[in-house]
């Protein structure tokens, strides 16, 4: 399976880079993983709704240009469906079973994802109703994808 993670914004914190590198290395035993980091739009502190939409649309165009047309797209969004680790594993297993070899997770920038990206998504996934820094979500997502593959293979993993 080919897993791509498209994310907006540059990862700055060393500890997050190290964690993501570790899980990416572990994932290579199960799938090809590609993390695509896109530039974010600079946004001043106080934005109008229209300015926020313009920024999300610009970031969205960059995201959409990187999505493989054959990919099953899972957008991370606060309004998405919450799943257990086992349910995420089941989703990945079913996609593989039904011939979807390309799965693309999308993490938006600080303002979220554009309407166009949300419409392109085959499903929306939420890890919580709380808001998290998009940089931290990269680490959480990579760990959960790794955990999902371990679950699918019946391999032990901490609960």
From Swiss-Prot:
Main location as per UniProt: cytoplasm
Name the reaction it catalyses: pseudouridine(1915) in 23S rRNA + S-adenosyl-L-methionine = N(3)-methylpseudouridine(1915) in 23S rRNA + S-adenosyl-L-homocysteine + H(+)
User: What EC designation does it have?
Assistant: 2.1.1.177
Which parts of the chain span the membrane according to its record?
Answer: none
Q: Does the keyword Transferase apply?
A: yes
- Provide the protein's localization: Cytoplasm
Q: Which domain of life is it from?
A: Bacteria
Q: Which CDD domains match?
A: RlmH-like
Q: Which GO terms describe its molecular function?
A: rRNA (pseudouridine-N3-)-methyltransferase activity
Disulphide-bridged cysteine pairs? none
Q: What class of enzyme is it?
A: transferase
Q: Which controlled-vocabulary keywords does the entry list?
A: Cytoplasm, Methyltransferase, rRNA processing, S-adenosyl-L-methionine, Transferase
Question: Which residues does S-adenosyl-L-methionine bind?
Answer: 76, 108, 127-132
Gene Ontology cellular component?
cytoplasm
Similarity remark: Belongs to the RNA methyltransferase RlmH family.
Q: How does it assemble?
A: Homodimer.
Question: Entry's NCBIfam families?
Answer: PRK00103.1-3 (NF000985), tRNA_RlmH_YbeA (TIGR00246)
Annotated function: Specifically methylates the pseudouridine at position 1915 (m3Psi1915) in 23S rRNA.
Q: What is this protein called?
A: Ribosomal RNA large subunit methyltransferase H
Primary gene name: rlmH
């Amino acid at each position: 399976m080919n897993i791509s993670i498209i994310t907006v914004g540059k990862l700055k914190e060393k500890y997050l880079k190290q964690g993501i590198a570790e899980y990416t290395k572990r994932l290579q035993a199960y799938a090809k993983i590609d993390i695509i980091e896109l530039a974010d739009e600079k946004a001043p502190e106080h934005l109008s709704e229209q300015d926020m939409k313009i920024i999300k649309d610009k970031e969205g165009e960059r995201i959409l240009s990187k999505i493989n047309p054959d990919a099953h797209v899972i957008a991370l969004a606060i309004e998405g469906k919450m799943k257990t680790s086992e349910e995420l594993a089941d989703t990945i297993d079913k996609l593989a079973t039904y011939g979807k070899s390309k799965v693309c997770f999308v993490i938006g920038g600080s303002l979220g994802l554009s309407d166009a990206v949300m419409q392109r998504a085959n499903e929306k996934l939420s890890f919580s109703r709380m808001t998290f820094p998009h940089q931290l979500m990269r680490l959480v997502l990579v760990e959960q994808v790794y955990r999902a593959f371990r679950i699918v293979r019946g391999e032990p993993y901490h609960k």
